[in-house]
Design a protein with these regions (language model features):
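Basic, low-complexity terminal or inter-domain segments flanking catalytic cores
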Residues: 1-198
Length: 198
């Protein structure tokens, strides 16, 4: 394999390589190899880092929308078994497009990642809020937010304060609490004195 350089988002080396299935480019993400395939008329040896990254993002079903500035982590558009969603360090938000043939439902919060200008600071903030991000850890700069899980079919949704791998259950009425109360629950859950809010 030939090294083309480091992937800007995950800082892993990107390789150009020939495998059983033919020429490819690949890198590691979360301890898994992710691949991209050059177009038929491309010479593998001519592929530089930018093109390799483009091929990997195109073919691995992930697309970087923007890199969040506090954490340095990418906000990704992914395809999962339930369709398209936006993902950021374990927090996710499903794409929800308005219906084409009938009026929008005022109770539904539509979310279309293709209609957004990711150069715009307000858009980035809107995306982070949609992902339920509240702030950033004072030491690791990892995002802190609320993750909602459904433990089983019969159960209600359960809310967790999440930062990195750590998830601590929190009251279901978390969003109805005063901001000060929310913040003290977060500090207590993560054993921190303060954190940067978004």
């Amino acid at each position: 394999p030939k090294e083309t350089g480091k992937h800007p988002a995950c800082q892993e080396m990107v390789f150009a390589d020939i495998i059983i299935n033919g020429p490819c480019v690949w890198t590691m993400r979360e301890e898994k190899k992710i691949f991209g395939s050059p177009d038929d008329d491309e010479n593998l040896l001519d592929i530089g880092l930018n093109r390799a990254v483009e091929l990997i993002e195109r073919d691995s079903g992930e697309h970087i929308l923007f890199t969040e500035s506090n954490s340095g982590l990418p906000v990704l558009l992914k395809n999962g078994r339930f369709g398209e969603y936006t993902e950021f360090d374990g927090f996710n938000k499903a794409t929800k497009l308005p219906p084409e043939d009938k009026p929008k439902n005022p109770k539904v919060s539509y979310y279309d990642p293709h209609e957004m200008d990711y150069e715009n600071a307000e858009t980035k903030l809107f995306v982070l809020k949609s992902l339920r991000i509240i702030g950033f850890h004072p030491e690791s700069n990892k995002p802190i937010g609320i993750k909602i899980r459904k433990p089983g079919k019969a159960f209600k949704f359960v809310k967790f304060i999440k930062c990195g791998e750590k998830e601590i259950e929190c009251p279901n009425d978390f969003y109805k609490l005063e901001i000060d109360e929310q913040n003290s629950l977060i500090k207590e859950a993560l054993s921190i004195d303060n954190f940067k809010t978004i």
